[in-house]
């Protein structure tokens, strides 16, 4: 369903007295479908944050019954200090839903499901794998920020008909050690067909962002994190039944581990609940 169809459907549906939630991506849509009462809430999924924002800007000009809420991934925008959101549009707590789940009380459940342990892991073992995964995804997030600041247009995503960015080019599959900034930079430059960018200039940008001492949860992007996890599962860290998981299967595991009770501890939930209470609309299960 394209954004014009969604906009017209919401604008013309005078019988709907509940809430419409517009999200980007299938994972976000499925998560909110699991948490909401379908009689009181309609979930609309669009492909990009730009489409969510465009829809919310258009709907803000239309008088209608019911209430519409947009939810977009932060995608490092608050850290970059850019973009004012339209009315009734909220950011995720961290850069996206996946990193919200990763930095929540759901992670121990995810770790026990995905990773191989000789015995039930204690808190220190859970924290160790959490820290390792965050550190490996962090360097990619840092390079994303440098790229945004410089305007190089590097590619980190998997496009149609395009091969994946190979994380094993800068992360050692055998022990998950980091091969260094040059390996990361070369992998992303090659993936982006931007070999002319100077590595020393990129490394200066990485040094600057690291001196700023941001929290990892401000920098790490869910797409990178789930790719790192999928790579980790392919060596001794993974269980036999999860060793062949790809990024999409890891994301499903994240969603299944994230309960409504855990979601209620998030700032996003508090923001949604506050807005809905103001309008006298209850929509969660």
Locations of the language-model features?
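Acidic, divalent-metal-binding catalytic cores of TOPRIM
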Residues: 1-285
